[in-house]
Every structure is written in C-alpha cells, then in structure tokens.
Amino acid sequence: MEAQHNETEAAGKPAAKKTTRTRKPRASKQATFIAEAPAMPIAIKEPGQFGRVNILNCQPSVEDDVYAARVEIGEQFTVSAQVFMEGRTKVGATAVLKNPRGRIMARVPMTVENAGLDLYTAKLQAGEHSTLNPWDAEFAEVKKQLGNWRVAIEGWEDTYGAWLHDARIKVDVLSDVENTLTSGSELLTRWASTRDANLNAEQRKTLREAAKSMMDTSLDAKSRLTFADNADIEALHETNPLRDGLTSSGDHVFHVERPKSSFSAWYQFFPRSEGAYLDDNGKKVQGNFHTAVSGLERAKAEGFNIVYLPPIFPIGVTNRKGPDGALNAGPDDPGSPFGIGSELGGHDTVDPLLGTMDDFKAFCQRAHELNLEVALDFALQCSPDHPWVKEHPNWFRTKPDGSIAYAENPPKKYQDIYPIDFDNDLEGIEREVERIMNLWIDAGVTIFRVDNPHTKPVRFWQDVIAAVTKKHPEVLFLAEAFTRPAMVRALSYAGFTQSHCYFPWRNTKPQLEEFLQETNGKGGYYQHNTFWPTTPDILTAYVRDGGVAAHAIRAVLAALGSPSWGIYNGYELIENRQRADAEEQSSNEKFEIKVRDWSAANRIGISKLLTSLNEIRSKHAATTSYHNLTILPSANENIIAFARQTEGRFTKDGRTDTLIVVVNLDPYNEQQSSIHVDAKALGLPTEHPYRVKDQLTGREYDWSWDNFVSLAPWADVAHVFHVETGEQPLD
C-alpha cells in the first residue's frame, strides 16, 4: 500500500547547531513521498489500533501526555519506545522531530537499548542552544523556536537486515543460494526505486549496480553476496533504509522553553545589605539600589547569570518582627521583607528605603549590561498594613470575633503576615496579580521566584502563569515549595519552570545517588530541580559543622549535580552560625541588615571555587541537560562519582563532551576509593587508557575501566575530569 509522510532534506541528520549566537533555523522542504513497499493493508496506525509494526510505551510521557514534557531550547534529551513485529521479524525505528509549525527538523535512527524488551532509544535536540537574553535584539529568533515541538516514533520492517542475516548463514553452508541471492538482488532494486529512502542519484546507482552484480553466476556465492554485504550498503542502511510496513505513533508534545529555563546559575542577595555600613555611632546604615550594584558585580565576577532579590516592597509596621523573628521589634529594626505592605503601598510599590521605581529600573538596566537577569521574589501575602486589607477585605479570612487570621504553621505563628483567602474572589485576585507581575516585567524583571506557592491553589498559579506568559513568553517562574512530592509535581505541571528541592538534606552517598538520578531522570522532563546548598531559611547541620570543606563539597555537588543551581550570598564567607531553635542562620538576614567584610572571601577560597565551577559549566555542554547523568560505582561510601555526557552532534565543536565528577563527602577526613567507568557504555576507549584533565586543578591522569582516587578536605575535595578523547573538532 502507499504510506505518506514528510521527509527531511538530509535523513537522519538534525538541523545545524551552534552554541552562542542563534540564527534562524533552517527547516527542510516538506514534500510527500510514496513508499513503494509490498502491499500491507494495516501499515498505517490508526488511533486505538495497532499498525503493521507495533509501537508501545513512547517516552517520556507526563501523566499519559496530559501535560507536555519540557526541555530547554538546544538541550539534549532522550526518547524511547517499544517497537516490534510478530515472530522473529526484524524491525527498525526512527524518531521524527517537528517544530511548532509542523516542519520536520530531524529524522534520527533509533538504537536498540534492550533487545529483550524491544526497547529503542534516540537522542534529540529541539532548536539551537543559545545564551541570548530576552533583551538582546537577536532573541526574536530564539522566540520563534520556542513552544510545542512534537516527536513521533516510526517503526518499520527491516527487510534488508533480516535478509542479510539469513543470507550470510545460507551462503556459508550453501543452502538455497540462488533463491537467496535473487531475493537480495530484487530487494536492492526495489530499495533503489523507493522514494521513501530519499536516495540521491549516486546512492541509487550503487544499489542498482550491486543488484546486477549479485546475479553474475560466473562468481561464487560468497563473492556475489559481498555486493550486498559491505560498508557502503551498510551505511545506506543506517541513513537511508528501506522501510517496509511503515507505521507511525501519534505525536508526543515537548514544550521547548527559552535559555535558562533549565541551565542557570542563581545568586541571591538582599539589596538593603549591599553597601550597608556602621556609622560613627555604630548604627547600621542600609544599602539601596545604587549600592546594590556591588552585588551585581560580585555575581558577574563569580560567573552567575541570574540575580535573585527578596521582596523589595514596603514593609509593614504592625506586628513587625525583630531579630531572628522576635515578636517585638525595636525602633531601628527593618523588619522582614516578607511582611509586605504599608501605608506607602503594596506589591506594586518600591520600598522608599531602597529607592524609587526609576532607581530599580536603572538597577535592572545595569544588570542587563552585565548579562545578568533579575529575578524578583513574589510572596503572595500581606502585612496587616497592606492596602489590600482595607480595599479587599474579602480576600482575607476572618475569625469569629471579626479579626483577620494571621498565618500559622503550628507551633509557628506569623503575626506580621496575613495569608490570602482565594475562595471569595479568585478571578479578582488573579487579575491583580497579573497586573502587578506585568508592572515588574516592564521594569526589567524576567523571572519570578514565588514564595510558598504550595499554600495557594494550583489552579490559581496555572491561570496566572498562563496569562503572564501569553503576553511575556520569556518570563520564568521558580517555585519555592518544600512540600510533598505530589504538590511540587502539580506546580510544575501548572507552569513553574524550576523548583527548589530537598537537595540540602541529601548528604549521604545513597541519598545523593537516588536524588541525582531522580532529578536527572524522567522527573527532569517536568520538574527542574534547582540545587541550593543554603538559603536564608536553610542551614543544615552538615554545612554548619563541616566548615570550608563542607561548603566546597556542597558547591561542587550543586553546580554539577543539576543544570540549575544557586548560591545565597555570604556562602563565600562561611556564614554558618545556626539558630538554636531552627535549621537556619542566626542573625538572619530576613530580619536585619548585614554588614559584611568581603575582603575575607579571597582568603577563604570559596569565591574562587564558585567562579571555577561556573566557568566549567559555561565551557562544557555536558552540564546543560537534565537527561545525561550516569552514576559511577565507587567502593567507598564516602566517595560519590557520576558522569555527564553530551554527544558530539549536540556540541558546538562537534566533539563529545564527557565530564567525570568525583567528590569526597567527608568534610573531615581523607578518603580513597576505586571508581569503575563503563568505557563501552560511554563510548570511551576500551582497549587502552584515555586521558582525563581535572578542570579544577589542571592536573592530568590516565584512566580506564577501574581507577584510584584519593581526596582530602585540606587539599582537593573533588575531581572534575574532562575526558580528552582526541576527537578532532568540526570545521
């Protein structure tokens, strides 16, 4: 029968790529070709029915394709499916990638991952990797590549492969030779004339001449077989196969998001602490948006690309909290920026102590000049002084005595915060939040970090994010939701681009191995975990007690364990004094202004390490994907090792990028271990050693299958090896 489908100009080859600047991608011409295959009345797969080839379990699938899997533009990702036919019939499979306009951008042959399970896989890349920012003029071309891409799996009977398998056996024992060779000659002739194979004139000529030579009875059988069994024909079989019984799955949607949706490096600081100092009387003088430029410059110097600010709105006076959340605030206590709203304004107003809206716009402009995006904390809650309390009393819950209920998480009480009640005027609250977010976007904000979104209805966030991104598709959302996995997953489905996660509490080797695989496995298609060693709300015992070594260990794990990571400023200064009653810093910056001596950072060395880690990330494509991490076996429970690898067809220079990360988890003692590397699985040399170069120290070693490491907290807490394969870069 006739099977119709679209072809690319170069079958099996993805569109051309580059890493930094992005040009308009070239799409192949779309044409309809007729597959001249034997009559197979069920070759086309109808919805709910099996085709001639059976295709099952197409992955990734998020909630049975109710929600789209998500990847960053240019990010390497893997698709898989079970493809099979009856009996011992050989099959082949192809992954077909289509852009939002339906054009086929790549047709990639799939490889057998598990023959017993009929499982085939292929690695794909949607669009071209870019480092452009939303304000760059060229970003318009990036935007054209964003949106819903589609992947279909094509299965087909591998007639040539099956014939060749049997022909080798029969010719070797001289069984039914003439019928076998005649069938092969006819197969090559049909292959040469099949338009589905998309052969050029030279390739068709090769097949026809081979078919003719196979019928030369003056030659012995083995010589005749070689005309169909050689490297040239095998190469055509890989790139331009004869595909009988062609069957296609339905399209599976992948939502392709803009740069930094997956691969990002965050730096958090409080503007009021930047440039703060003690006056002659020992009184703290807070910083503002002018002095906070120093935070931008520090973030840039250390290699971060997103600066994240806590709420910058007016702070309430009623029930204002004192140091470390004390119930009674003194006259000079600045209060928590999360107690939002005063007589000066609410979420749409700049705190006058920080400056004006024009000052904030100038701050954002300076950030953009430094190639830094500005992320703003959006905490949807109010102080008792917020204008909404008077303007929209139905947005809050009242107690039987008529008073408004403040926030509680027993035994904790937050008298300075009123939570929102969404059940009386959901649409009105949505419209107001959309208005406010658009206001800050116009001022220069491109990302919102949402505080405690899990305490609000998921549908609310789904509506708000959809409305905001419809107008501003470049805007990203980070969910600060330390809660149950189902809720975090739901928030991701609702549109949150990234998520805070439980990385700070994953400290042992088993915990980390499980969490790394969870983050970089199927979950990475809908939930982008961002690894933060500490935050203003989190200071674990591991970091508290482990000193400089613990800070270094956690930084390496965060930077290389996830494509997205973040640092809360002060990490460089080992600020690790913990409150007695909470797992967070004492003298917490949420409640007071910090005056810091940044000159100590160079002496401690963490700042230099952060810079090195971000430099490694910027140079190595292997660090950019949530779908390329492999745990490596190590013999010591205090040593963890993993590899990240991106294939050469997805890198700027065409060379496969492989990183091997080895970390000592013990911040007190030297640890030694053997590390096993499955060289074959990673495509590394199997018969001889290969060279690895430590990206932190520059030292080089010869590695192979099993390797010895020794790491000490007073020397190197980690190795970050780049495998020097000797591949030549593309011209």
UniProtKB/Swiss-Prot annotation:
Q: Where is this site: Transition state stabilizer?
A: D537
Q: Where is this region: Disordered?
A: 1-31
List the catalytic residues.
Answer: D451 (nucleophile), E480 (proton donor)
Composition-biased stretches (Basic residues): 15-27
Signal peptide position in this chain? none
Q: Which SUPFAM superfamilies match?
A: (Trans)glycosidases (SSF51445)
Task: Report residues binding alpha-maltose 1-phosphate.
Answer: K321, Q381, D416, N452, K590, F591
Q: Which GO terms describe its biological process?
A: alpha-glucan biosynthetic process
Catalytic activity, per the record?
alpha-maltose 1-phosphate + [(1->4)-alpha-D-glucosyl](n) = [(1->4)-alpha-D-glucosyl](n+2) + phosphate
Under HAMAP family, the record lists:
GlgE
- Please give the subunit comment from the record: Homodimer.
Know the name of this protein? Alpha-1,4-glucan:maltose-1-phosphate maltosyltransferase
Species annotation: Bifidobacterium animalis subsp. lactis (strain Bl-04 / DGCC2908 / RB 4825 / SD5219)
